[in-house]
Amino acid sequence: AICSLVLYLLTLMLMEKLSSNTVDAQEVELIWTILPAIVLILLALPSLQILYMMDEIDEPDLTLKAIGHQWYWTYEYTDFKDLSFDSYMVPTSELPSGHFRLLEVDHRVVVPMESPIRVIITAGDVLHSWAVPTLGVKTDAIPGRLNQTSFITTRPGIFYGQCSEICGANHSYMPIVVESTPLTHFENWSSLLSISSSL
């Protein structure tokens, strides 16, 4: 539509149907400056509102805090008392057969499927980024700042990701593994982990 209008005006100018008074008129310049500005504002305001609405989950079923360190992640399940752990990459020499090299961790993040999950992300030392592409999640972890993202898994499975911010020599050794399970399995896992951490 805009290209058509520009081509139409260009054609009129080349055919000299527009006089020099029309081309140099202040009114025309004012109109073609203000009209696009109004259109852009009318497009931007609803877009910004939708952008902020997409980032918020009204009432998540589970809130998880991910803290990036050089070169591992700490996870805290804030809805549970004393449920936290560090997650390190499993070295290739200790990797079980059939697991992915540089992607497997010693403690996976376990979440219930079909539940809104909020992840609060920060860092303890340098910039990191918590990214799980198959969940459509990538959020920067910045020291001293809390960022949040959210997701819902619709099926059980294991979702792999990595730190996607160059954070030092071992940046590629910060995998993220999210395991989505049915709610009953998640409840069993969380109670077992709570018991083992209290011992």
UniProtKB/Swiss-Prot annotation:
GO terms for molecular function: copper ion binding; cytochrome-c oxidase activity. It is found in: Mitochondrion inner membrane. Cu cation A2 binds at C163, E165, C167, H171. Residues 55-199 are mitochondrial intermembrane. It comes from the Eukaryota. InterPro entries: CcO_II, CcO_II-like_C, CcO_II_C, Copper_CuA, Cupredoxin, Cyt_c_oxidase_su2, Cyt_c_oxidase_su2_TM_dom, Cyt_c_oxidase_su2_TM_sf. This is Cytochrome c oxidase subunit 2. It comes from Casuarius bennetti (Dwarf cassowary).
